[in-house]
């Protein structure tokens, strides 16, 4: 994957939401970078207000990404995989009981945008709903008050599956 493709994906994923609860975001993106030209493999947090990646772990993350995604190899085989960390406490303070739903709504909207951006760039994408919550939080060195994982995602070059062709 090229840096231009990754930039386009991140820009598309972080466009402000137009919803009744729009305002500050509750979901933080963490990227497991495996194969992005010119970007060292590692785990990065994405800061949309600065359009900046901050590396928090160095080295090959393929085994970790797959393992954290309940052993799903596609998280390790993709060019980049994502953990979406939702700040449920802040959402609850802002929106009461509905905050929990708004965090998941935001993660779903980000996932939809990741699908659309990947498809527009000729890449494949898939949401991953199975992951180890506590292991992800520990791996990313997040304290409980920093949020919890709500969704995983992977983007890379598609591998055609003849079983799916009609």
Set out the residue ranges of the language-model regions.
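Hydrophobic alpha-helix feature that most strongly marks membrane-spanning transmembrane helices
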Residues: 14, 34, 87-90, 112-119, ...
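Active-site-adjacent "gating/activation" loops or surface patches in catalytic cores
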Residues: 72-100
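C-terminal helix-cap and adjacent tail motif
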Residues: 152-166
């Amino acid at each position: 994957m090229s840096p231009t493709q990754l930039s386009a994906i991140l820009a598309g994923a972080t466009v402000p939401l137009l919803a009744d609860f729009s305002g500050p975001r509750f979901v933080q993106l963490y990227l497991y970078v495996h194969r992005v030209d010119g970007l060292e493999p590692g785990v990065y947090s994405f800061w949309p207000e600065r359009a900046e990646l901050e590396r928090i772990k160095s080295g090959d993350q393929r085994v970790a990404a797959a393992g954290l995604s309940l052993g799903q190899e596609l998280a390790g085989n993709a060019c980049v995989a994502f953990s979406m960390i939702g700040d449920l406490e802040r959402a609850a303070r802002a929106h009461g009981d509905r905050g929990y739903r708004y965090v998941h709504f935001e993660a779903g909207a980000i996932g939809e945008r990741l699908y659309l951006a990947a498809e527009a760039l000729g890449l494949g994408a898939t949401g991953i709903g199975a992951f180890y919550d506590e292991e992800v939080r520990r791996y990313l060195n997040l304290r409980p008050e920093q949020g919890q994982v709500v969704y995983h995602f992977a983007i890379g070059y598609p591998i055609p599956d003849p079983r799916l062709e009609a």
